[in-house]
Amino acid sequence: MELVGRIETRPVEGARDLDLFVKLPFRLPEQRPNRVPPLLTDEREFHDPKKNPQLTQCDVQRWVAWRDGKVVGRIMGIIQKSYNAAHGERTARFYNLDCVRDADVVHALIGATEQWARSKGMDRMIGPFGFSDKDPQGLQIEGFEHLPVIATPINPDWLPPMVEACG
């Protein structure tokens, strides 16, 4: 658990925390007007090691951010060991970054992931980037007036500058 300002980041531990993590995007206010939420069954399967073998082949850590007793964000850190070995890298990835409109929350979540990555010997972090290039990656930076298409990043327009400010 890490406390940054009023924001507390807690690692996801156990089924109850994972359920909260998976359902969090459905509870967040202030998302983009044309937002189409992911299918809950797809989200559950993505985070189920019985359905997604990447979860057993990578180092993965998830966090939920809290402020004043309320859930305000989530993020997942990934170390894709086989990719790093094949490319001679020590790169971590962040993924599933969803939160309320608050730069402090974004900073706390990315900071927790960065600290975890360093503790695992990583010297670089990229994201949003999932397990592979088959997962939606990156941030949408324009075209928010249009409905999203399948397998593309879906984020509010205020998120990219907040992520960029984290370095």
Describe the role of every protein-language-model region.
Residues 1-2, 151:
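Short aromatic-glycine motifs in intrinsically disordered, low-complexity regions
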Residues 2-50:
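Short amphipathic alpha-helix that is part of the acyltransferase structural core
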Residues 79-81:
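A short acidic/small-residue loop/turn micro-motif
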